[in-house]
Regions:
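Helical segment within the ABC ATPase nucleotide-binding domain
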Residues: 104-116
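ABC-family nucleotide-binding domains
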Residues: 92, 99
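Conserved P-loop NTPase catalytic core
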Residues: 1-68, 147-150, 155, 161-167
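Conserved catalytic motifs of ABC-family nucleotide-binding domains
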Residues: 85
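H-loop/switch region of ABC-family ATPase nucleotide-binding domains
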Residues: 124-125
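A short, surface-exposed alpha-helical micro-motif characterized by mixed small hydrophobic
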Residues: 130-132
Length: 176
């Protein structure tokens, strides 16, 4: 899940259904033969994801994503990436610039994937987000790990001190 949803996450002038299969367009499920798209299956898949991930779009799966809110664009990216069923999901700034409702939705989706046994790596500058959805926090400063924290036993203030480079208690060992 890229940090810049417009530059790396979506093709803004494509409709929602084509954005939802960007990484999967070549799969047999979405094709008829070697080059022809199976529009019916693509549309059904899009409608399922729109419902499952609460993606709000004015014209359903035919909505041009440029016209959608940032929160709904982000939910579409999350839907697409989760539906690829990765063992490891890397989410960079997954809720940057989103409203409270969209943030809650995305956090719930990430937590659901974690609960299914998936590894979720979240890179975020949002301290509350890090504390809310993390099982383990590794803090970096100037490219180095400076702390390993348990979110249940740390505060925003302590986490902020590590992020600012004021604290460094992590002794990196080979193999960690």
């Amino acid at each position: 899940i890229p940090e810049d949803r417009h530059k790396y996450g979506m093709v803004l002038d494509y409709d929602l259904q084509n954005n939802l299969i960007l990484e999967n367009y070549w799969k047999t499920r979405y094709t008829k033969g070697k080059a022809i798209q199976n529009k019916k299956t693509i549309n059904e898949n899009s409608n399922e994801l729109i419902d499952k991930y609460d993606i709000r779009s004015g014209q359903g799966s035919s909505t041009i994503v440029r016209s959608m809110s940032g929160g709904n664009q982000q939910k579409a990216i999350i839907a697409r990436e989760i539906e690829r069923d990765p063992e490891i999901l890397v989410a960079v700034q997954p809720t940057r610039g989103l409203d409270v409702g969209a943030i809650e939705n995305i956090h719930n989706q990430l937590i659901n994937e974690r609960d299914k046994g998936k590894a979720i790596l979240v890179v975020s500058y949002e301290l509350d987000e890090v504390l809310k959805i993390s099982d383990r926090i590794l803090v970096m400063f100037k490219g180095q790990i400076v702390g390993e924290l348990d979110p249940k036993n740390t505060t925003r203030e302590e986490l902020g001190l590590y992020m600012a480079g004021s604290k460094n208690t992590y002794n990196f060992k080979e193999g960690d």
